[in-house]
Design a protein with these regions (language model features):
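Glycine- and acidic/polar-rich repeat regions and solenoidal domains
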Residues: 1-270, 288, 299
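Active-site and glycan-interaction determinants of carbohydrate-active enzymes
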Residues: 273-301
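Long, compositionally biased
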Residues: 305-308
Length: 308
């Protein structure tokens, strides 16, 4: 068929959460008819929880998201984006106000891609205010891609054999007409459609008010407020910053590179850290690897090899 699960709910004006949940599903071989933009899971609105799903073997994205305050956790995504380019296993983009989303404790590996390639987590066209915490990325072309966004947090992740682990650009500053139309027209209209200077947006996302002066000055929007901290990069190219972005705009701290983190069994893709791992010395927090993926419940009474 085409896409797997589509979900919307909640109120973006008031940031009222729907509290819908997509949990413990095995989604595979989707996008069979339409090869692009038919993800395993598509969600919109406010406050959904996407947990403990196994999603694999799709030609395009596994999860596409829009909206606010979604929690994406304990999912296992692999062999995604096999027939497309400029795509992410997880994808969102092009709205300053879609913030407060959290991706934590997911395992993403073996993303494919043609042409421009693929990303593990793709924050496209200035997607902002997203937390990427405690995930494991292995064999991803680009593991985390921040395309001009602001106030994103990349923390406590493990990157193995990715090229690069993190890439950040400043496309919001590009003077070319195509980017000015996207930033100054499309994204400005979406920003103005939300009353971001009054609650709940002004209190929940105070950084939004810092964007308005840049529009007044007509100088483009820089990728400020991004944080890359306490990550492990092993066997990977580490960090690429370019296309109008500068390292001075980004907080980069306490990351471990080019040192063996002492995985339990790298060859078996068991990326739990041994108790004597040097990563703990700079404050790295244990990732609950044993909780990632499907689990046994009243609907799933056994886990087959294909469920892991």
């Amino acid at each position: 068929g085409d896409s797997g699960i589509r979900l919307s709910g909640g109120d973006r004006t008031t940031l009222t959460k729907a509290n819908h949940r997509i949990e413990n599903n095995h989604i595979a071989h989707f996008g069979e008819w339409s090869r692009c933009y038919q993800p395993g899971i598509s969600l919109a609105g406010v406050g959904h929880r996407i947990r403990h799903n196994l999603i694999h073997d799709g030609p395009h994205s596994a999860i596409q998201l829009s909206g606010n305050e979604h929690l994406i956790e304990y999912n296992h995504l692999h062999h995604i984006c096999g027939e497309s380019g400029d795509v992410g296993a997880f994808y969102m983009g092009r709205d300053w106000t879609e913030r407060g989303n959290v991706l934590r404790y997911n395992f993403i590996h073996d993303t494919g891609g043609v042409g421009m390639g693929s990303m593990g987590v793709y924050l496209d066209d200035c997607a902002s205010g997203t937390t990427i915490f405690g995930n494991i990325f292995s064999r991803c072309t680009r593991a985390v891609f921040i395309g001009g966004g602001r106030n994103n947090r990349v923390e406590n992740n493990i990157f193995v054999d990715c090229a690069p682990a993190v890439q950040i650009d400043g496309r919001g500053l590009d003077p070319a007409p195509v980017w000015r139309q996207m930033i100054d027209q499309i994204m400005k209209e979406r920003l103005d459609a939300i009353d971001y200077l009054t609650p709940p947006y002004s209190t929940r996302y105070p950084d939004l008010k810092q964007i308005a002066p840049y529009y007044t000055a007509e100088v483009g929007i820089p990728p400020e407020g991004n944080l890359v901290v306490r990550n492990i990069c092993y066997g990977s190219q580490w960090l690429e910053i370019g296309w109008h972005a500068e390292e001075s705009l980004i907080a980069i701290q306490y990351n471990m590179r080019d040192e063996d983190p002492l995985f339990v069994d790298e060859h078996a893709m068991d990326y739990q850290l041994r108790i004597d791992s040097p990563a703990y010395e700079f404050g790295f927090k244990r990732i609950p690897v044993d909780k990632i993926g499907l689990y046994i419940d009243e609907h799933r009474t056994v886990l087959e090899d294909s469920d892991r």
